[in-house]
Amino acid sequence: TGGGAPLCLVNDRKARISAACELLWADGEPPYYSAVYPEHKYNFFLYYKGDAEEYAPEQRTQGSITKFFRIDGTQDLISAYARPGTEDAERLPDNDETKYLMNHAGDLVYSTKSARLHVEPHLRVKHELAQVNFKVQAFDDLAAQGREIRIQAVALVIPTKAQFTVAADWAGVSHDWTDETNVPPTGIVWETERDTVYLPHENTPEEFGSTYQMENAMFNPEPGVSDPKAEPMKIGTQLLVPPVDEMGVIIHYRLITTRPDDLIPSGSLFTARYANLHFEGGFQAGKQHEVLLKVYGPQRVDLEIDGLPGWIDGGDVEIPE
């Protein structure tokens, strides 16, 4: 559907969510509920991919639908399934129909019989990616040395190909509507292949894949740091990344110096590369994280995440590039 609207897949039929949050079916006829079989049970699933690229045809089996998406750090992949909660039960009238429904909830939700009691699909939404923001700060008094470090571009080396099971066979809602451990086998398996994805900024082109090219993500003006007393400076916008605990980091930067006797010429370019970095706990799906670039000088840039100690394993700096 246009505009990257979420898709619901119900018995091979498609729908989109309108601007008014209405479910609009492609052929105009809702595929549920059955008037002939009022106790026939349905499951509902939803996914959202933004403008993620489909790199392989979808796979449909008797028990699942799997899509294959490639991300570039700007898309939020979302999954959802329908199940009622305690609040849905509290809205039900106190009558025999409700008692029957609650005694047979595992067999009747969602169905024509439950719909007549206004038990509508209650979607539980999950963000499958983590949001990562970046800041930079001087950790040595570069200003006193007549030096400044300017950041040109930052990249993460991460998996970008997702095998996304968007719908799957599931027994569905149990009799206990508060049992949140009963979930369908949907979600993402990430391929091990990695790509270099650059941190975008406001002027990075919006076309898919633009963040794979450094020239699309070079900061202009370049954020510079020299005073360790200054607050950390936010750089770029954000990256949406898989929930991984190992990745690579690449930082491109330049030295600006006013010292005529400096052994490194002003304008010299550097690249700090950190390969196979492991961080305890990793990035968590649906959560925000912050990576701080700690600049000590042209030959040392450390990394810190969420205010915790630095990454396990180190990196190397090419001087100059």
Predicted regions and their residues:
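Extended low-complexity, serine/threonine- and proline-enriched intrinsically disordered segments
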Residues: 1-7, 144-190, 195
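Extracellular low-complexity Ser/Thr/Asn/Gly-rich intrinsically disordered segments
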Residues: 4, 258, 269-277, 306, ...
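Intrinsically disordered, low-complexity repeat and linker tracts
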Residues: 283-321
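Long, low-complexity, repeat-rich, intrinsically disordered, solvent-exposed domains used
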Residues: 236-243
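Short, low-hydrophobicity acidic/polar segments
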Residues: 1-150, 158-160, 196-211, 215-219, ...
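C2-type phospholipid-binding modules
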Residues: 267-290
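Solvent-exposed, low-complexity segments and loops of surface/extracellular structural proteins
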Residues: 115, 179, 186-198, 205, ...
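Cysteine-clustered segments with highest specificity for TGF-beta superfamily mature ligands
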Residues: 231, 243-254
